[in-house]
């Protein structure tokens, strides 16, 4: 089977939030082999871009020669380029068959200008040879105005796709102007450095794996949304953290979490049994949440059985906790219920953040899990590690452990069991 090699050609951001490092991290998590060529060294962080040193044309060419001599490349994704780099990419495009995904990085989010009019004129030739161009709204307007002002439509004989990126993206083509499709997004209240790089390299990676354009954009959108939600906090802002949450990842996490649970003498099992669940990113319904179709139940030997399989849509009860918690922290995608013990809660307060709800305060005609989780999160001011209630009306008291995924949740349960065993 042909190896998926993507060639990333762009600038070097030492923080890895943008540029070839961000692109390579994105390609790697998507199962594509990232070959990278650096066109310029760009000292920067979330505060500013401090400088830009272009790599000599000879060294860029030697990097290209080294790669094409030894690898088959199906997609080339471009970031910050200079004139030499564009000249060379177009030269190699004449001799090798690869798709170009061009992310026209005209300036940084910290307003450092990467492209002057002379270089933008050369970019038009690269756009003409590209399969897809991914400008943000401002870059798109700059490009179209430049072509109009300089009457350059005659230099364009092909019709590349353009994805105008934003929270909602608009798919069009360079010549047809009309919007073919709008891809709706979800806004997270964060300014994250490098999202354009992650989004365009994710789309390029899915294309490299053989996905069609629309599927590549749709999956790329999930990648960049996760990369924003799990972004790395820096002193001045956030750096993109290339992350991809899909059904395969959720099932793998759950399987490994159950593997870890079986390694301990887990005894904090409630009468109704435990379940453990993990959701896709920003789940819309319990169908986006995977859990056990059965339960974790005590056996007569003091141990426990894990009954059932892991399936999406298997648990509405635990799913409601996750579906509610995500509104307070979109990173929280997992939960497991364990047995409540009176003196355990006090013992846990040193290591874990805890909140609770009281069933006696529950209003009529509500889902207890939705109301209780909302109540506990609002009282806590976010999503705590633990939400408990002391039961009532024939309902068993319960502890619910929450986390970013089921592996983290089980590691918390292992710690809780240790504390319980030593009370
Ligand atoms: N705060 C956010 N919440 C959700 N999605 C976001 C957010 N910021 C960026 N994105 C996603 O990242 C994609 C690219 O972001 P944007 O359009 O800002 O590119 P850009 O301006 O080129 O970014 P940069 O220059 O920082 O690399 C958007 O299409 C959007 O899906
Ligand atoms: C190296 C590099 N590539 C792309 C961007 C776009 O944000 C940046 N700031 N730095």
Can you annotate each of these PLM segments?
Residues 24-26, 142, 189-213, 217:
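Short, small-residue alpha-helix embedded
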Residues 30-35, 180-182, 206-221:
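Phosphate-handling active-site elements
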Residues 342-423:
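C-terminal binding/interaction regions
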Residues 2-8, 20-109, 242-243:
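Conserved N-terminal subdomain of the carbohydrate kinase-like
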Residues 248-360:
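Extended, low-hydrophobicity segments enriched in charged/polar residues
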Residues 54, 70, 215-284:
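Charged C-terminal helix
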Residues 132, 139-140, 153-190, 229-234:
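Conserved phosphate-donor
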Residues 75-150, 164-171:
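Conserved beta-alpha-beta core of the PfkB/ribokinase-like small-molecule kinase fold
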């Amino acid at each position: 089977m042909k190896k998926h090699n993507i060639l990333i050609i762009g600038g070097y951001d030492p923080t890895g939030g943008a540029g070839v490092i961000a692109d390579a991290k994105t390609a790697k998590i998507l199962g594509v082999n990232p070959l990278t060529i650096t066109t310029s060294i760009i000292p920067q962080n979330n505060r500013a871009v401090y400088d830009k040193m272009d790599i000599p044309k000879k060294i860029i060419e030697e990097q290209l020669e080294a790669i094409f001599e030894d690898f088959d490349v199906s997609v080339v994704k471009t970031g910050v380029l200079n004139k030499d780099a564009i000249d060379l990419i177009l030269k190699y495009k004449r001799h090798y068959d690869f798709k170009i995904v061009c992310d026209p990085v005209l300036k940084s989010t910290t307003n450092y200008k990467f492209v002057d009019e002379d270089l933008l004129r050369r970019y038009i030739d690269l756009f003409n040879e590209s399969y897809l161009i991914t400008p943000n709204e401002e870059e798109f307007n700059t490009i179209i105005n430049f072509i109009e002002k300089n009457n350059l439509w005659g230099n364009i004989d092909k019709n590349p796709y353009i994805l105008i990126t934003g929270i909602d993206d608009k798919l069009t083509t360079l010549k047809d102007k009309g919007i073919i499709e709008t891809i709706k997004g979800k806004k997270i209240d964060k300014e994250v450095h490098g999202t354009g790089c992650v989004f365009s390299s994710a789309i390029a990676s899915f294309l490299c794996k053989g996905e069609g354009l629309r599927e590549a954009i749709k999956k790329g959108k999930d990648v960049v949304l996760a990369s924003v939600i799990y972004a790395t906090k820096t002193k001045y802002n956030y750096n993109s953290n290339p992350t991809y949450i899909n059904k395969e990842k959720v099932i793998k996490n759950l399987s490994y979490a159950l593997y870890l649970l079986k390694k301990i003498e887990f005894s904090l099992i409630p009468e109704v049994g435990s379940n453990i669940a993990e959701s896709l990113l920003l789940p819309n319904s319990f169908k986006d949440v995977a859990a056990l179709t059965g339960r974790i139940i005590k056996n007569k030997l003091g141990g426990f059985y894990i009954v059932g399989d892991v399936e999406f849509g298997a648990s509405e009860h635990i799913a409601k906790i996750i579906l509610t918690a995500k509104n307070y922290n979109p990173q929280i995608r997992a939960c497991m219920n364990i047995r409540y013990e009176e003196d355990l809660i006090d013992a846990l307060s040193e290591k874990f953040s805890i909140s609770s709800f009281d069933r006696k305060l529950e209003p009529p005609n509500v889902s207890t899990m939705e109301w209780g989780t909302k109540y506990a999160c609002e009282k806590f001011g976010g999503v705590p590690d633990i939400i408990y209630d002391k039961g009532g009306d024939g309902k068993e008291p319960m502890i619910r452990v929450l986390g970013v995924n089921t592996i983290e949740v089980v590691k918390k349960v292992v710690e809780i069991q240790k504390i319980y065993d030593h009370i």
